[in-house]
């Protein structure tokens, strides 16, 4: 699951390109189950929210938003591990 290390690195990049790259990397797993697809969508939504937070708010809010995105990504990873 090297893909997850790459996506986790993208969380720190926080750009529109990073969101697109994460979507491309995670799309390969969407067909496994509806639950996994929903978890991926939840992660991507939180990642987009993180981008907004980084661009629009003070730095004190950046780390909590990054932590939330990482938690959502961990959920996707856990679901995929159970599915395999």
Kindly give the residue locations of the regions a language model identified.
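Alpha-solenoid helical-repeat scaffolds
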Residues: 1, 12, 16, 37-41, ...
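General structural signal for alpha-helix termini and helix-helix connectors
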Residues: 9, 13, 31, 53-60
């Amino acid at each position: 699951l090297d893909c997850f290390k790459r996506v986790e690195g993208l969380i720190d990049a926080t750009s529109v390109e990073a969101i697109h790259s994460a979507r491309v990397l995670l799309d390969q797993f969407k067909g496994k189950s509806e639950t996994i697809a929903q978890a991926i969508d939840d992660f991507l939504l939180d990642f987009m929210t993180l981008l907004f937070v980084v661009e629009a708010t003070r730095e004190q809010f950046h780390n909590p938003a990054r932590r939330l995105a990482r938690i959502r990504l961990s959920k996707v990873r856990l679901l995929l591990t159970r599915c395999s």
